[in-house]
Amino acid sequence: MTPAASLSSVGLVLALALAGCDILPGKARARAIEETAATPAMAFDALYARQCAGCHGTGGRLGAARPLNDPVYLALVPAERLRLVIAEGVPGTAQPAFARSAGGGLTEEQIDALVQGLVRAWARPEETKSVQVPPYAAALGDPDRGKAVYAAACAGCHGADGRGGPKAGSVVDPSYLALVSDQYLRTTVIAGRADVGMPDWRGYISGRPLAPVEISDVVGWLVAQRRPVPGRPVASASDPR
């Protein structure tokens, strides 16, 4: 064999060996892992666990933020508003934006998967289909009337002055009111927090639910207790998030 032929043979062997690396043990698995890592997660359970559970609780309950595993809340909030809150966050509060277009890390498809997954997993429409839920958003009511509503509907748990009572904590704490939006307060009055024993608007006064005007008035009273915190923006009263 001539030197040139020997070199050609060696080159052919090396080329075949290098080509064969793709079928070596572990090679296909490594490539699959790389491709999986580059594919955005779309499963609701995985998205919720990674993005939401830290604040809203494992299984949608008992977190620092309001429970999402709540059929009354999901019957109250319009789907497009729920999507907006997840995608763009709530300015002036601890709710961040998750959409990439707003500085977060999720695609539009992932945002849709979260919204659809929340409704599919936890809405339970059979429990709320006959319930006339109050309006999600409304103008703030009269604080003076709201003070009377608070005394009748809320003081038994939260104390006469709102600073905490035998069953529940303060609703006028400056740090709390600085962290939440007007709409959050309204949503909490309507939907309650079943995971910690707080009833919804039907359970505050024996024998009847709160009327829509009473809800707006007591929210107006709560908002009137808020004090500005230097350097911290407050969510706009006109922004129903």
For the regions a language model picked out, list residue spans one by one.
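Bacterial N-terminal signal peptides that target proteins for export
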Residues: M1-V10
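Sec-dependent N-terminal signal peptides
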Residues: V10-L16
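Gly/Gly-Pro-rich "capping" loops immediately C-terminal to redox-active cysteine motifs
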Residues: E34, A38-A41, D45, G57-A87, ...
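The canonical Cys-X-X-Cys-His
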Residues: F44, Y48-T58, L114, G146-A160, ...
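Axial heme c-ligation environment in periplasmic c-type cytochrome domains
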Residues: G63-D70, E88-A121, Q132, Y136, ...
